[in-house]
Amino acid sequence: QPNAELVTDPIERVEAGGVRTKDGRLHELDVLVLATGFDGHSFMRPMDLIGRDGVDLKDVWAETTQAHRSISLPGFPNYFMLVGPNSPIGNFSLIDISERQLGYIMQLIELWRGGTVNEISARQDAADRFNASVKDAMGDTVWVTGCQSWYLDKHGNPAMWPFTFDKFCDDMSVPDLDE
């Protein structure tokens, strides 16, 4: 638009009349928008993570970013993450969510340490059920009613937790070894 300009030059300083860039030019403005290029769907990246049979996480998440219970991935044994895809970080306390996820993960690690299991990896069918339930529960919530935002991936799959805090607490209380 004629009344808008995208300026990508390095900023020298912000002044009362606008923003002065390193080239000495003063850009008069009414609004200053600082865009950092945040990508809400780049969980764990740019880290290289290779799972069973040489599968690369970048390939697994090339189309959509999903995980089982927001903490584990089928085909990536003994790998866990905090605040992964569909973690309820937009509607609850990040600290409380992280602590509950860590408690769940520690229970799984204790099962491994105690010899109950040799490895821990989410089953694909369990992850598929979890992700389908998340998508179904979004229904007509504000996150999926037509606005494009970081709450949705490029295919419209939700990145948020659509359930209650109580359900999250229940889901993080005791590991289900059938999953």
Predicted features along the sequence, with ranges:
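Flavin (primarily FAD) cofactor-binding/catalytic cores of flavoenzymes
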Residues: 1-93, 99-114, 174-178
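C-terminal, flexible cofactor-proximal segment of oxidoreductases
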Residues: 67, 80-179
